[in-house]
Amino acid sequence: MTVVVCLFPVYWMISTAFKPSKDIQSADPQLFPHTWTLTHFQRAVDADGFALFWRNSILVTLGAVLLALLVALGAAFAVARMRWKGRRQFMLMVFIAQMAPWESLIIPVYIISRDTDMLDRLPTLTLIYFMITLPFTIVVLRGFIGTIPPELEEAAQVDGCTRTGAFWRVAMPLLAPGLMATSLFGFITAWNEFAYANFLIIKQQDNRTLPVWLSSFQNTFGTDWGATMAASTLFALPALVIFLLLQRHVTSGFAAGAVKG
Protein backbone atom coordinates (compact mmCIF):
# COMPACT_ATOMS: atom_id res chain seq x y z
CA MET A 1 0.00 0.00 0.00
CA THR A 2 2.84 2.39 0.85
CA VAL A 3 4.43 1.74 -2.54
CA VAL A 4 1.13 2.47 -4.29
CA VAL A 5 0.67 5.73 -2.39
CA CYS A 6 4.23 6.83 -3.21
CA LEU A 7 4.12 5.85 -6.88
CA PHE A 8 0.62 7.09 -7.69
CA PRO A 9 1.68 10.76 -8.18
CA VAL A 10 4.37 9.57 -10.60
CA TYR A 11 1.83 7.48 -12.51
CA TRP A 12 -0.60 10.41 -12.59
CA MET A 13 2.10 12.71 -13.96
CA ILE A 14 3.01 10.29 -16.75
CA SER A 15 -0.58 9.41 -17.65
CA THR A 16 -1.59 13.09 -17.70
CA ALA A 17 1.25 13.82 -20.11
CA PHE A 18 -0.38 11.47 -22.64
CA LYS A 19 -3.99 12.62 -22.17
CA PRO A 20 -5.68 15.11 -24.53
CA SER A 21 -6.36 18.52 -22.98
CA LYS A 22 -10.12 17.90 -22.83
CA ASP A 23 -9.57 14.78 -20.70
CA ILE A 24 -7.17 16.62 -18.37
CA GLN A 25 -9.73 19.36 -17.74
CA SER A 26 -12.65 16.95 -17.48
CA ALA A 27 -14.71 16.97 -14.28
CA ASP A 28 -14.55 13.16 -14.37
CA PRO A 29 -10.85 12.23 -13.99
CA GLN A 30 -9.67 9.12 -15.82
CA LEU A 31 -7.08 6.87 -14.20
CA PHE A 32 -6.07 5.49 -17.60
CA PRO A 33 -5.94 7.53 -20.82
CA HIS A 34 -8.57 6.34 -23.28
CA THR A 35 -6.98 8.47 -26.01
CA TRP A 36 -3.22 8.86 -26.24
CA THR A 37 -1.47 11.93 -27.62
CA LEU A 38 2.10 13.23 -27.90
CA THR A 39 0.99 16.82 -28.39
CA HIS A 40 2.04 17.86 -24.90
CA PHE A 41 5.53 16.43 -25.37
CA GLN A 42 5.84 18.28 -28.67
CA ARG A 43 4.78 21.51 -26.99
CA ALA A 44 7.29 20.97 -24.17
CA VAL A 45 10.16 20.28 -26.58
CA ASP A 46 9.22 23.31 -28.71
CA ALA A 47 9.09 25.61 -25.68
CA ASP A 48 11.61 28.46 -25.56
CA GLY A 49 14.96 27.42 -24.13
CA PHE A 50 14.32 23.68 -23.94
CA ALA A 51 17.73 22.61 -25.27
CA LEU A 52 19.54 25.50 -23.56
CA PHE A 53 18.21 24.71 -20.10
CA TRP A 54 18.94 21.01 -20.56
CA ARG A 55 22.53 21.93 -21.33
CA ASN A 56 22.72 24.21 -18.28
CA SER A 57 21.40 21.51 -15.96
CA ILE A 58 23.76 18.88 -17.35
CA LEU A 59 26.81 21.15 -17.04
CA VAL A 60 26.00 22.25 -13.50
CA THR A 61 25.09 18.75 -12.30
CA LEU A 62 28.09 16.96 -13.79
CA GLY A 63 30.45 19.69 -12.60
CA ALA A 64 29.15 19.48 -9.03
CA VAL A 65 29.25 15.66 -8.96
CA LEU A 66 32.78 15.37 -10.34
CA LEU A 67 34.12 18.10 -8.05
CA ALA A 68 32.47 16.52 -5.00
CA LEU A 69 33.89 13.09 -5.86
CA LEU A 70 37.40 14.46 -6.33
CA VAL A 71 37.49 16.42 -3.06
CA ALA A 72 35.58 13.83 -1.03
CA LEU A 73 37.84 11.02 -2.18
CA GLY A 74 40.91 12.81 -0.85
CA ALA A 75 39.19 13.75 2.40
CA ALA A 76 37.77 10.25 2.94
CA PHE A 77 41.17 8.66 2.32
CA ALA A 78 42.85 11.03 4.77
CA VAL A 79 40.29 10.26 7.49
CA ALA A 80 40.14 6.50 6.92
CA ARG A 81 43.83 5.77 6.34
CA MET A 82 45.79 8.48 8.19
CA ARG A 83 46.08 9.52 11.82
CA TRP A 84 46.28 13.26 12.34
CA LYS A 85 45.29 15.77 14.97
CA GLY A 86 41.75 17.08 14.55
CA ARG A 87 40.50 14.10 12.55
CA ARG A 88 37.54 13.48 14.83
CA GLN A 89 36.68 17.18 14.96
CA PHE A 90 36.80 17.29 11.16
CA MET A 91 34.34 14.41 10.86
CA LEU A 92 32.09 16.04 13.46
CA MET A 93 31.94 19.18 11.31
CA VAL A 94 31.20 17.03 8.26
CA PHE A 95 28.28 15.36 10.06
CA ILE A 96 26.95 18.75 11.18
CA ALA A 97 27.21 20.09 7.62
CA GLN A 98 25.40 17.01 6.33
CA MET A 99 22.49 17.60 8.70
CA ALA A 100 22.33 21.36 8.12
CA PRO A 101 19.28 22.67 6.22
CA TRP A 102 20.98 24.32 3.26
CA GLU A 103 17.89 26.35 2.41
CA SER A 104 18.49 28.36 5.60
CA LEU A 105 21.72 29.71 4.07
CA ILE A 106 20.14 31.05 0.92
CA ILE A 107 20.17 34.69 2.10
CA PRO A 108 23.87 34.69 3.13
CA VAL A 109 24.76 32.90 -0.10
CA TYR A 110 22.84 35.50 -2.08
CA ILE A 111 24.65 38.36 -0.32
CA ILE A 112 28.06 36.76 -0.90
CA SER A 113 27.23 36.08 -4.55
CA ARG A 114 26.05 39.66 -5.03
CA ASP A 115 29.13 41.18 -3.41
CA THR A 116 31.50 39.00 -5.43
CA ASP A 117 29.66 39.55 -8.72
CA MET A 118 28.71 35.87 -8.93
CA LEU A 119 24.96 36.25 -9.41
CA ASP A 120 23.43 34.88 -12.61
CA ARG A 121 26.38 32.54 -13.20
CA LEU A 122 26.32 28.78 -13.67
CA PRO A 123 29.66 28.27 -11.81
CA THR A 124 27.95 29.70 -8.72
CA LEU A 125 25.29 26.99 -8.84
CA THR A 126 27.98 24.37 -9.46
CA LEU A 127 29.88 25.43 -6.32
CA ILE A 128 26.71 25.50 -4.22
CA TYR A 129 25.62 22.03 -5.33
CA PHE A 130 29.17 20.81 -4.72
CA MET A 131 29.03 22.08 -1.13
CA ILE A 132 25.59 20.55 -0.57
CA THR A 133 26.63 17.07 -1.74
CA LEU A 134 30.19 17.06 -0.35
CA PRO A 135 29.46 16.08 3.31
CA PHE A 136 27.35 13.06 2.38
CA THR A 137 29.93 11.97 -0.19
CA ILE A 138 32.73 12.16 2.37
CA VAL A 139 30.77 10.14 4.94
CA VAL A 140 29.88 7.34 2.53
CA LEU A 141 33.32 7.09 0.91
CA ARG A 142 35.04 7.16 4.30
CA GLY A 143 32.94 4.22 5.46
CA PHE A 144 33.56 2.39 2.20
CA ILE A 145 37.35 2.88 2.34
CA GLY A 146 37.23 1.59 5.91
CA THR A 147 35.94 -1.78 4.64
CA ILE A 148 38.93 -2.25 2.31
CA PRO A 149 41.79 -4.04 4.14
CA PRO A 150 44.85 -1.77 4.25
CA GLU A 151 46.99 -4.89 3.82
CA LEU A 152 46.07 -4.89 0.13
CA GLU A 153 47.66 -1.48 -0.33
CA GLU A 154 50.63 -2.44 1.83
CA ALA A 155 51.26 -5.49 -0.36
CA ALA A 156 51.25 -3.26 -3.44
CA GLN A 157 53.73 -0.92 -1.76
CA VAL A 158 56.01 -3.87 -1.04
CA ASP A 159 55.90 -4.63 -4.76
CA GLY A 160 57.16 -1.13 -5.52
CA CYS A 161 54.05 1.07 -5.66
CA THR A 162 53.97 4.40 -3.91
CA ARG A 163 51.23 5.00 -1.35
CA THR A 164 49.24 7.00 -3.87
CA GLY A 165 49.88 4.47 -6.60
CA ALA A 166 48.78 1.60 -4.38
CA PHE A 167 45.54 3.40 -3.59
CA TRP A 168 44.73 4.11 -7.22
CA ARG A 169 45.66 0.63 -8.47
CA VAL A 170 44.27 -1.47 -5.62
CA ALA A 171 41.61 0.46 -3.69
CA MET A 172 40.02 2.46 -6.49
CA PRO A 173 38.59 -0.54 -8.39
CA LEU A 174 37.05 -1.77 -5.12
CA LEU A 175 35.53 1.67 -4.54
CA ALA A 176 33.41 1.55 -7.70
CA PRO A 177 30.08 0.78 -5.92
CA GLY A 178 30.67 3.58 -3.40
CA LEU A 179 31.57 6.04 -6.13
CA MET A 180 28.45 5.10 -8.10
CA ALA A 181 26.23 5.42 -5.03
CA THR A 182 27.51 8.87 -4.11
CA SER A 183 27.47 9.97 -7.75
CA LEU A 184 23.80 9.06 -8.02
CA PHE A 185 22.98 10.94 -4.82
CA GLY A 186 24.86 14.01 -6.01
CA PHE A 187 23.27 13.84 -9.45
CA ILE A 188 19.72 13.65 -8.11
CA THR A 189 20.36 16.42 -5.56
CA ALA A 190 21.84 18.84 -8.08
CA TRP A 191 19.45 17.86 -10.90
CA ASN A 192 16.33 18.50 -8.80
CA GLU A 193 17.46 21.61 -6.88
CA PHE A 194 15.13 24.56 -7.39
CA ALA A 195 15.52 27.13 -4.59
CA TYR A 196 19.07 28.32 -5.26
CA ALA A 197 18.65 28.19 -9.04
CA ASN A 198 15.51 30.29 -8.81
CA PHE A 199 16.96 32.73 -6.27
CA LEU A 200 20.43 33.33 -7.75
CA ILE A 201 19.59 33.45 -11.47
CA ILE A 202 17.72 36.74 -11.74
CA LYS A 203 18.70 38.78 -14.79
CA GLN A 204 20.41 36.24 -17.05
CA GLN A 205 17.40 34.04 -17.77
CA ASP A 206 19.44 32.03 -20.28
CA ASN A 207 21.35 30.60 -17.29
CA ARG A 208 18.25 29.01 -15.76
CA THR A 209 18.15 25.28 -15.11
CA LEU A 210 15.38 22.79 -15.84
CA PRO A 211 13.57 22.95 -12.46
CA VAL A 212 13.16 26.71 -12.90
CA TRP A 213 12.21 26.30 -16.56
CA LEU A 214 9.31 24.03 -15.56
CA SER A 215 7.64 26.97 -13.86
CA SER A 216 7.47 28.77 -17.23
CA PHE A 217 4.35 26.74 -18.08
CA GLN A 218 2.49 28.71 -15.42
CA ASN A 219 1.29 32.20 -16.29
CA THR A 220 -1.41 34.72 -15.41
CA PHE A 221 -3.89 32.85 -17.62
CA GLY A 222 -3.44 29.53 -15.83
CA THR A 223 -1.28 26.43 -16.08
CA ASP A 224 -0.77 24.26 -19.14
CA TRP A 225 -1.01 21.00 -17.21
CA GLY A 226 -0.44 18.76 -20.20
CA ALA A 227 2.82 20.44 -21.19
CA THR A 228 3.87 20.73 -17.54
CA MET A 229 3.42 17.01 -16.95
CA ALA A 230 5.15 16.14 -20.23
CA ALA A 231 8.10 18.39 -19.37
CA SER A 232 8.23 16.94 -15.85
CA THR A 233 8.28 13.41 -17.28
CA LEU A 234 11.18 14.29 -19.57
CA PHE A 235 12.92 16.00 -16.66
CA ALA A 236 12.64 12.88 -14.47
CA LEU A 237 13.92 10.47 -17.11
CA PRO A 238 17.72 10.99 -16.70
CA ALA A 239 17.71 10.36 -12.94
CA LEU A 240 15.40 7.36 -13.37
CA VAL A 241 17.52 5.79 -16.11
CA ILE A 242 20.76 6.31 -14.17
CA PHE A 243 19.21 4.83 -11.03
CA LEU A 244 17.97 1.74 -12.87
CA LEU A 245 21.37 1.21 -14.48
CA LEU A 246 23.29 1.62 -11.21
CA GLN A 247 20.75 0.16 -8.79
CA ARG A 248 22.75 -2.95 -7.90
CA HIS A 249 25.94 -0.98 -7.33
CA VAL A 250 24.11 1.72 -5.41
CA THR A 251 22.59 -0.77 -2.96
CA SER A 252 25.92 -2.42 -2.20
CA GLY A 253 27.65 0.95 -2.06
CA PHE A 254 25.34 2.42 0.55
CA ALA A 255 25.40 -0.80 2.58
CA ALA A 256 29.18 -0.92 2.65
CA GLY A 257 29.48 2.81 3.30
CA ALA A 258 27.27 2.52 6.35
CA VAL A 259 29.42 -0.12 8.04
CA LYS A 260 32.03 2.22 9.42
CA GLY A 261 30.56 5.57 8.31
Spans of features found by a protein language model:
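A structural signal for multi-pass alpha-helical bundles of membrane permease subunits
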Residues: 1-261
